[in-house]
Amino acid sequence: MIRIKLGDIFESEMKTLVNTINCVGVMGKGIAKIYKDRYPKMFEEYKDMCTKKLIHTGYLYPYYEDNSVKILNFPTKQHWRSPSKLEYIQEGLNWFIQNYERLKITSIAFPPLGCGNGGLDWETVGPLMYQSLKDLPIDIEIYAPFGTEKSKLQVEFLLVNENKVNKTGVIYEKINNNWLLVLQLIKKLEESEYNIKVGRTIFSKNMLCFYQDMGLI
């Protein structure tokens, strides 16, 4: 049975939880950071495996507690700075389908793979995960991102063609607040009735001095 849910994956009663990871030994953001804090031994083991180049996309790394898979680490990106790719999600899901019996996994909870810091959206990932996992004879929970519309948790939505949407995540860099201040200042000057037209060279030199004073360059 497969269920689509909203909520905290750490409150799941499934025996195995899935963690999303990169392949360079960093768990600094998002759900991976929570796993790192909750399971420090798992993190040290994962970091060591990354150092030995044993972690790669298309392979899910199981972490055992009490002789069973407690955490299944799922690479959704190569480097922590890079966006997730849908092909990595598909490869990992294929690996899981081929290996869950060998790992003796009987119930499992997945986060929205590649969403959040990975840059993929639920409209892409949700249908792919549902269609890949829905026929497996084990208990599966898939947690959608917080704030997902209820209509996008329904089977009718999840059965749409996942190939219609972008397959690479998008990483948006947060703009430096100082630069934002400069842009707003320039806009105000241009709109001002006291705006004095100057040549490009003089303007550039003055702005260069301003940037240096602001510590932007």
Each predicted region: which residue ranges?
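Macrodomain-like recognition of ADP-ribose-binding/processing modules
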Residues: 1-217
